[in-house]
């Protein structure tokens, strides 16, 4: 389920979705091959009758993988391989739980076989599609390279992601009826600069490209695809007005939040109590720390955390710093491992927060940032979360400049939040828990 806001990359997304769907349908041969292997193994009594039956059941995780890859076709270029890993592995890792709930006997070997074959199939499809279309762009306006550098802050991001950008071959200016002479069949699209001056010749070239069914992208759209951020410096009012959320997915997301939080209760509640006891024994003061934060639709709510600072310092509204002297010895550990966030699962159950979304900010800071950064309030269109796109991409933000960068990630999430993006964030959060990235 994808956001309903209209993206300037809709045509690219549609192309990638079409490619995923076609490749997934061809991949049914993978299931047939797995079934044939299982049948042969059963005939020679090298496997039980459960093997081919399990292969048939594995059409469910195969379909889930296909749907997730289809749903994630709009994700930033640099996240494609990570999401491919998540989308191909997670359904098969969850398969034993599904068999247990259904009380259905199954073959672990069959699950492993179908997973390996389907993962190889979708990986092959990814590299095939990427080699054919994904990385070759031409630009019509000479200002495009400079604009990309301004928006991204580092032109090397193009080369780091193997994105080829070259000028579009155009006819001589004396041609009364100019036509594009470039071989556009090998291009993923043509980039134009909406701020570039226009004339009759440029308009005819653009119309010629459209008649050839060439995809046209604004320079801002390409920057967004590369960086996974909304470009605040070029964000127009109508772009913000289009951020209308994703009501259908909101319901699924809320039910998932409640279900996962309750299912994990036997794990996180004892862990929270143990960490809280360590906080209490380490320094004088309460176990918990609360603060007013701003949530969905700008509503205030009280957030709960395990106290990680000295009690007399904890209520001060200021950004945490590297090696902050207010943080206790136990506080450093629970911050690095994110254990201090566990009480917020109560906020998730209450509906103040979601498991995934922009991090809720202190009310004092929100008032300041909303005054200085006009687009800031739009991050409150969705529920705040325990972890979010800005957290896994940027880490902790301090000061107005880093907050603006954080906002660009948050607005990207608001515009595109979906099951695919939430799965990617969950995967990256799990990795971060082992590294301590972004902890202060």
Where are the model-predicted features located?
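A short, structured surface patch at a secondary-structure boundary
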Residues: 322-383, 425-433
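Short, glycine-rich, amphipathic interfacial segments at transmembrane boundaries or analogous
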Residues: 223-224, 229-231, 288-329, 386-406
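Hydrophobic alpha-helical transmembrane segments and immediately flanking/interface helices
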Residues: 116-132, 331-337, 346
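N-terminal hydrophobic signal-anchor/signal peptide
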Residues: 2-31, 122-266
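Signature of alpha-helical transmembrane segments in polytopic membrane proteins
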Residues: 1-128
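Phosphate/oxyanion-binding loops and surfaces in catalytic or ligand/nucleic-acid-binding neighborhoods
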Residues: 212, 284, 309, 372, ...
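A hydrophobic, helix-centered structural microdomain
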Residues: 249-313, 347, 419, 424-440
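C-terminal terminal-structure detector
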Residues: 2-10, 377-440
């Amino acid at each position: 389920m994808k956001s309903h806001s209209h993206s300037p990359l809709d045509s690219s997304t549609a192309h990638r979705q079409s490619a995923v769907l076609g490749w997934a349908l061809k991949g049914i041969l993978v299931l047939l091959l797995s079934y044939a292997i299982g049948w042969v193994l059963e005939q020679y009594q090298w496997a039980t009758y459960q093997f081919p039956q399990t292969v048939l059941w594995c059409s469910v995780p195969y379909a889930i993988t296909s749907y997730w890859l289809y749903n994630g076709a709009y994700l930033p270029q640099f996240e494609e391989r990570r999401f491919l890993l998540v989308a191909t592995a997670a359904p098969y890792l969850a398969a034993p739980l599904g068999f247990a709930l259904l009380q259905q006997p199954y073959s672990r070997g069959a699950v492993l076989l179908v997973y390996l074959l389907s993962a190889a199939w979708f990986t092959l499809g990814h590299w095939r599609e990427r080699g054919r279309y994904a990385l070759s762009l031409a630009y019509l306006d000479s200002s495009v390279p400079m604009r990309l550098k301004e928006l991204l802050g580092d032109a090397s991001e193009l080369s780091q992601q193997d994105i080829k950008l070259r000028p579009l071959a155009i006819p001589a200016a004396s041609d009364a009826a100019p036509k594009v002479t470039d071989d556009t069949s090998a291009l993923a699209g043509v980039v134009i600069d909406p701020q570039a001056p226009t004339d009759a010749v440029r308009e005819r070239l653009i119309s010629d490209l459209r008649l050839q069914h060439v995809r046209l992208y604004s320079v801002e759209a390409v920057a967004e695809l590369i960086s996974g951020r909304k470009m605040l410096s070029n964000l127009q009012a109508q772009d913000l007005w289009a951020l209308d959320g994703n009501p259908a997915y909101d319901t699924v997301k809320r039910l998932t939040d409640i279900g996962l939080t309750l299912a994990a209760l036997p794990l996180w509640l004892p862990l929270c109590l143990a960490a809280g006891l360590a906080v209490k024994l380490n320094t004088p003061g309460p176990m918990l720390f609360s603060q007013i934060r701003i949530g969905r639709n700008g509503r205030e709510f009280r957030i709960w955390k395990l106290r990680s600072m000295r009690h007399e310092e904890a209520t001060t509204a200021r950004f945490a710093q590297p090696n902050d002297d207010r943080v206790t010895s136990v506080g450093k550990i629970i911050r690095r491992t994110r254990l201090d966030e566990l009480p917020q699962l109560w906020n998730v159950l209450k509906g103040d927060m979601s498991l995934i979304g922009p991090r809720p900010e202190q009310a004092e800071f929100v008032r300041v940032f909303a005054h200085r950064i006009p687009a800031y309030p739009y991050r409150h269109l969705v529920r705040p979360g325990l972890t979010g796109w800005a957290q896994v991409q940027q880490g902790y933000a301090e000061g107005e400049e880093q907050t603006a960068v954080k906002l660009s990630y948050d607005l990207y999430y608001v515009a595109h939040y979906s099951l695919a993006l939430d799965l990617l964030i969950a995967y990256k959060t799990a990795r971060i828990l082992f590294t301590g990235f972004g902890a202060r």
